[in-house]
Amino acid sequence: MDKVLNREESMELMDLLGLDRSAWGNIPVMRKAYLKKCKELHPDKGGDEDKMKRMNFLYKKMEQGVKVAHQPDFGTWNSSEVGCDFPPNSDTLYCKEWPNCATNPSVHCPCLMCMLKLRHRNRKFLRSSPLVWIDCYCFDCFRQWFGCDLTQEALHCWEKVLGDTPYRDLKL
């Protein structure tokens, strides 16, 4: 996510969206702010045309960069996306046993927290640069990116963001 726009462009986009810069990377929040600002800045509604054009350019560049970086087969379906082996209880979908899954993920646990953390460990050996939020959706990358402690409140925020994220983006 930190390579989609340069630092100046990302700060400018967050300012245009009216969001705190700490929200950078929270795509659902950025999308809602973008749609709201489109209504405010639209020239037909008395808004600033130049700001609207710049915001559209930066947002589309960010959106396209995320698609290219994280969805090389954008628009196609993978067989792993059609069905899943999660337990039927939605409470255990994200984290089966708090805080055990957060501190010591298990290969035998079907929760997203364990699967994403184990996937993170495997992927970090294949890359020369460190994994960051949006490259990796694990709870640790989320906490590091947004500066959260290991708390249930952070867990609930992570669950909310994952709930708004398409399954294919998780790269499981």
From Swiss-Prot:
Keywords: Acetylation, Activator, Early protein, Host cytoplasm, Host nucleus, Host-virus interaction, Inhibition of host innate immune response by virus, Inhibition of host RIG-I by virus, Inhibition of host RLR pathway by virus, Metal-binding, Oncogene, Phosphoprotein, Transcription, Transcription regulation, Viral immunoevasion, Zinc, Zinc-finger. GO terms for molecular function: zinc ion binding. The keyword Lipid metabolism does not apply. GO terms for biological process: symbiont-mediated suppression of host cytoplasmic pattern recognition receptor signaling pathway via inhibition of RIG-I activity. It comes from the Viruses. One of its GO terms (cellular component) is host cell nucleus. Pfam families: Papo_T_antigen. Residues 12-75 form the J domain. A zinc finger (C4-type) spans 101-114. SMART domains: DnaJ. The common region of ST and LT proteins comprises the J domain. This domain is essential for multiple viral activities, including virion assembly, viral DNA replication, transformation and transcriptional activation. This domain is also required for cyclin A-transactivating activity of ST. Interacts with host PPP2R1A; the interaction inhibits PP2A activity. Interacts with agnoprotein; this interaction prevents agnoprotein dephosphorylation by host PP2A. Interacts with host RBL1 and RBL2. Interacts with SMARCA5. Interacts with SDHB. This is Small t antigen. It comes from JC polyomavirus.
